[in-house]
Structures are given as C-alpha cells and as structure tokens.
Regions:
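Conserved acidic segment of CheY-like receiver
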Residues: 2-38
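Short acidic, S/G/P-rich loop/turn micro-motifs used as interaction or catalytic elements
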Residues: 11-17, 40-46, 51-52, 77-85, ...
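Short, aromatic/basic amphipathic alpha-helical patches
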Residues: 18-27, 117-128
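A generic structural motif
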Residues: 32-41, 105-108, 136-145
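Conserved phosphotransfer microenvironments
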Residues: 48-95
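Conserved acidic residues
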Residues: 72, 132-135, 139
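A short, hydrophobic beta-strand element within the central beta-sheet of small alpha/beta folds
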Residues: 94-124
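C-terminal output/effector regions of signal-responsive regulators
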Residues: 149-173
Length: 173
C-alpha cells in the first residue's frame, strides 16, 4: 500500500473530514498518514485576558512532526488566527523549515476568491513586500480550493495525483 503524508492546519477541527478522506483513499490503495494542527492551541493568555499567538511554539510543533521530511501535502485554511496568522504565513514557515520543499501545497477557504487579493494587497505593505509575496506564491504550485462543497473529493484527487515531473525534480532524484 502506498503511503502519503499530510499536514493540515485549521483553527476548526477537520478530524471527521480527514478520517473520511483517509478511509476513501484506502479503497484506492493509499494509506494517509496525517497530522492536524490547530493554531489556536499555540496561543497564550495575557494578564489582560487577551490571547497572544505564539509563532515560535507553532514552528516547534511543525519541526516535531516525525514525517516532516517525507511530507507529500501541506494543506492550510487561509483564515486562521485573526490579524496574526494567515495560510500564507504558514507556507512561509514551511519554506523556512524545508527550503527545498517542492511537493503539494493547498490553501483553502470558504472565500477562496478573495485569498490572492488579500495576500498581495492587504498582507503586503508596499511594493517590495508585494514582490516578496509574489515570489512566495510562485515558489511552488499552490492549489486553491473552496472549503465548501466538493472539498473532500478535490483534496483526495490532489493526494492521488502524482506531481508532474520536471527536469529539475528528475535530476534531484
């Protein structure tokens, strides 16, 4: 049985969804090994009562995942921690941890149409930061999915589909 490794980051539990996807993939001869991360678990309560997101602890969690070096798919919701963490920030974090990661990345959101506009216009202050964001988006093929409707079928198809081999990836192997 072929084995695929997935990390999924969402502030809402996707456990049931992941179990269904895993069960369906087994029928296709694929064992899905996955880790679900809720970024809200990496927030600290301040004396004022407010929550403060701890990026360093989340990064340590990612590093501790036993199959990180064998990761096939990295999936993240776009809207995670209000004003502090978006899916694009997690992709940047992934590239910090795995600079040569060249496998599948999935960003999903109920408002997927607004994601790229948000990344380039709202998450970037000024032209230089917009260029940085565009380079980040272009570093790897990113799949954009709506979290509604056919999400489970589409993510299953992306997991099953082998990546197109380029001359660079063939030489790297």
């Amino acid at each position: 049985m072929e084995r695929k490794h997935l990390i999924l980051v969402d502030e809402q539990s996707q456990t049931d969804r992941l179990k269904r996807i895993s069960k369906n993939l087994k029928k296709d001869g694929i064992e899905l090994v996955y880790e679900e991360i809720n970024p809200n678990d990496y927030s600290n309560r301040l004396e004022s009562g407010d929550l403060e997101f701890d990026k360093h602890t989340l990064k340590k969690k990612l590093l501790s995942i036993r199959f990180l070096s064998h990761l096939d798919i990295f999936a993240t919701d776009y809207n995670l921690v209000e004003d502090e963490l978006k899916g694009i920030d997690l992709i940047a974090m992934l590239y910090e941890l795995l600079p040569h990661y060249n496998k599948k990345i999935i960003i999903y959101s109920a408002q997927i149409e607004d994601v790229i506009d948000n990344i380039i216009t709202k998450r970037a202050d000024g032209f230089k930061q917009q260029i940085t964001m565009l380079k980040l988006l272009a570093q790897n093929e990113i799949n954009y999915l709506s979290s509604d409707g056919e999400f489970e079928n589409k993510i299953k198809q992306l997991i099953i589909k082998e990546p197109d081999l380029t001359i660079d990836s063939r030489l790297a192997d």
